[in-house]
């Protein structure tokens, strides 16, 4: 797939205008909809189907802050992420992440919905702060630091999913 920003004719930047993204998505889907190619050759039908799939994939990248940041870094550096290398470089954050997991375990054992809600709010606030820092670093073209924060966002995403699973368990009781 080609650059998702160029496919949607958007500037390569972290902040996205969601209304513009939706508008461009609908236009591209209309342009490459397989029904428009029903009377064309099999090759043209296949090409339209692939283009439609590329549009859908690009949309998912542009909508997800982690995937969008990763794409920006790869476009500007030509370097594909090495997840293991980043993890070794960010030991302080990994220690913090482990502490958050211990706190989540403690909250789960105490079965306190109120503590869990407060913890989720805290983690989402931390995540938003990292997203803001990431946007700044991307604008400043500090790719290596931005890549590190992108990895942090991956951890936040996983932690939030785990918190939501604990929340579901607590609601079942």
From Swiss-Prot:
One of its GO terms (cellular component) is iron-sulfur cluster transfer complex. Transmembrane segments: none annotated. Belongs to the HscB family. It holds the Pfam family HSCB_C. Gene3D superfamilies: DnaJ domain (1.10.287.110), HscB, C-terminal domain (1.20.1280.20). Signal peptide: none annotated. This is Co-chaperone protein HscB homolog. The keyword Chaperone applies. Keywords: Chaperone. Residues 3-75 form the J domain. Co-chaperone involved in the maturation of iron-sulfur cluster-containing proteins. Seems to help targeting proteins to be folded toward HscA. Coiled coil: none annotated. It comes from Haemophilus ducreyi (strain 35000HP / ATCC 700724).
